[in-house]
């Protein structure tokens, strides 16, 4: 009797565990489904180490799924880079708003791993050297802080961890106009998206 009871309990526990561990694709990529995405990024700077110094970025965006697994997004990003000048660094900070569209390029049969490509329009403010014109060696910085605008191309690999949580690895190339520094700014990022 005791053995029979423990077998029933064990069977019920295994059934419950399997029910919650097996994916149910019915709740994935539904039109009008929304999500919130949080990412950390690293700008790719020529001649610099990938994770060098204070070069980093963070972003948060809202996603809205359309038909056929594609989605739109609205996001804000902050990115900081250090540009070497003699023996010290000049900080370049960007605060950007992005509006874009992502289209599925490739996926596995169960829609667990998806490869997306997309485009976005962006605009924001770029601050250079915390608005200080005079550098520590007495030189005057001719570049200035200003509003910037442009577009970006995106590529991402999105992996469903659960039906509502995705792990993301993204690459983007931003084209910024109105800037005095670099017009093309590539970056890589990783993060999570929570669909609801």
Whereabouts are the PLM-identified features?
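Short glycine/proline- and aromatic-enriched beta-strand/turn motifs that initiate or cap beta-hairpins
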Residues: 25-75, 193-195
